Amino acid sequence: DEEPKETCSDEMCVIYCKGEEYSTGVCDGPQKCKCSD
């Protein structure tokens, strides 16, 4: 089970919730995120 757990201080990142793309925004909180270019 590979989940996106990259830490990025970029404003362009995809927040994942339960393995699904939840929303786009700043990486903040315990949510896992995957940096998107």
From Swiss-Prot:
Organism, as annotated: Parabuthus villosus (Black hairy thick-tailed scorpion)
GO CC, alphabetical: extracellular region
Organ and tissue specificity: Expressed by the venom gland.
Keywords tagged on the record: Disulfide bond, Ion channel impairing toxin, Neurotoxin, Potassium channel impairing toxin, Secreted, Toxin, Voltage-gated potassium channel impairing toxin
Similarity comment text for this entry: Belongs to the short scorpion toxin superfamily. Potassium channel inhibitor family. Alpha-KTx 11 subfamily.
Role this protein plays: Binds and inhibits voltage-sensitive potassium channels. Inhibits the vertebrate potassium channel Kv1.1/KCNA1 with low affinity.
InterPro entries linked to this entry: Parabutoxin
GO biological processes: envenomation resulting in negative regulation of voltage-gated potassium channel activity in another organism
Name of the molecule in the record: Potassium channel toxin alpha-KTx 11.2
Subcellular locations according to the entry: Secreted
Top-level lineage group: Eukaryota
Disulfides per UniProt: 8-27, 13-33, 17-35
Molecular functions (GO terms): potassium channel inhibitor activity; toxin activity
UniProt comment concerning the protein's domains: Has the structural arrangement of an alpha-helix connected to antiparallel beta-sheets by disulfide bonds (CS-alpha/beta).
